[in-house]
Amino acid sequence: MVKMNKKDLALFCYPWDVIDEGYDAIIDAVKRSGLNSIYITVNYHSGMFFLPHSTKRKIYFPEPGALYFNPSDWHKKHSFQSPISNLTKNWNLFWEKLSSKCKQNNIKLCAWI
């Protein structure tokens, strides 16, 4: 488990922010703000989010309890299954690209649970 410490100055964000604004815009926001980490949620409850900064949508309702990653086979074997978000068809590629961009810019990437 990654613990926040005095050296972590993080942007907490949602996958829909990265998808809507783009990887480079998120990385740029972290750097311009003097931050060194991104904490991004991997699972979230329902709600209504106002997104005045977004050019794609002004309000977003996430899928209740959705996962923002492809779970292991263990997940498929149980009766209680959180839905996998349909924001993207390829969560593995989403995480690979975000991880790569963070590494290139010396930004720590952490899961916000």
Model-found features: residue ranges?
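Boundary/entry segment of secreted carbohydrate-active catalytic domains
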Residues: 2-21
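Surface-exposed amphipathic alpha-helices with a cationic face
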Residues: 2-3, 30-31, 95-110
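Hydrophobic faces of well-ordered beta-strands that scaffold small-molecule active sites
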Residues: 9-13, 38-40, 109-111
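Active-site-proximal loop/turn and secondary-structure-junction residues that shape catalytic pockets
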Residues: 15-17, 44-46, 113
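Residue-level marker of alpha-helix boundaries and capping positions
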Residues: 16-17, 88-89, 102
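Short alpha-helical segments and helix-capping/turn motifs at coil-helix boundaries
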Residues: 21-27, 93-98
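Catalytic domains of carbohydrate-active enzymes, especially glycoside hydrolases
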Residues: 24-48
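Aromatic- and acidic-residue-enriched carbohydrate-binding clefts of CAZyme catalytic domains
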Residues: 48-92
